[in-house]
Amino acid sequence: MLNRMYRYALLATVALALSGCILPGEQKPAPVEEAQPGTQQPTQPVPPPTQPVPTVPSVPSIPAQPGPIEHQPENATPEPKARTYDWNSAMAPMVGKMLQADGVNAGSVLLVDSVNNRTNGSLQTGPATEALRGALANNAKFTLVSAQQLSMAKQQLGLSPQDSLGSRSKAIGIARNVGAQYVLYANASGNVNAPTLQMQLMLVQTGEIIWSGKGAVQQTQ
């Protein structure tokens, strides 16, 4: 029993001696904290990415459409004045000579063609044709084919009432269609400011020109 107690006392003494051998200045290591399983460090929430706000493109303004450009004529060329002529003074003496021509049989039917313009300018032949028919209206030698008969005969050949008879063969065909024995041609030629009036009388049966004449025409304006 004493031996056992002695042994315990010896062990206690040795333990106390060992515990007192820690050198001064030595630091005990800091305790290490072990990370607990299942625990995580808190994290800051990441904000969602911002979406760009869609923008509506601005519509460009439409410029006002310009109105039609109206050009004011500057120094506009005035329209030429219509020329007028003294046709009656030119027709009467020529018709008188034609009625006295040899080979003209009294009582015959005469086809008068429209006056044809062969001048170097614009010339209204309507008044000339009217003056020619007027000079022949009261003659005692010819019976005139009416304007209505002549117009219908021209239309049958595809001509307008204002068209000239044209070729001699065409004139003969129309004259025979209306029963005329003579055709009187007339045309204005030369300078339009002072034209020359020419006439020809043709015998339908032979196509021969049995009379011709010419005279000056005076312009009144």
UniProtKB/Swiss-Prot annotation:
Gene: lpoB
Coiled-coil annotated residue ranges, if any: none
Biased composition (Pro residues): 44-57
Family matches, as InterPro entries: LpoB
NCBIfam families for this protein: lp
Membrane topology per record: Lipid-anchor
Lineage: Bacteria, Pseudomonadati, Pseudomonadota, Gammaproteobacteria, Enterobacterales
UniProtKB keywords: Cell outer membrane, Cell shape, Lipoprotein, Membrane, Palmitate, Peptidoglycan synthesis, Signal
UniProt function note: Regulator of peptidoglycan synthesis that is essential for the function of penicillin-binding protein 1B (PBP1b).
Gene Ontology CC terms: periplasmic side of cell outer membrane
Lipidation (S-diacylglycerol cysteine): 21
Signal peptide: 1-20
Compartment(s) of residence: Cell outer membrane
GO molecular function: enzyme regulator activity
Quaternary structure note: Interacts with PBP1b.
Region (Disordered): 29-82
PANTHER family: PENICILLIN-BINDING PROTEIN ACTIVATOR LPOB (PTHR40593:SF1)
GO biological process: peptidoglycan biosynthetic process; regulation of cell shape
Residue positions bearing lipid (N-palmitoyl cysteine): 21
One Pfam family in the UniProt entry: LpoB
Organism of origin: Cronobacter turicensis (strain DSM 18703 / CCUG 55852 / LMG 23827 / z3032)
Name of this protein: Penicillin-binding protein activator LpoB
Annotated family: Belongs to the LpoB family.
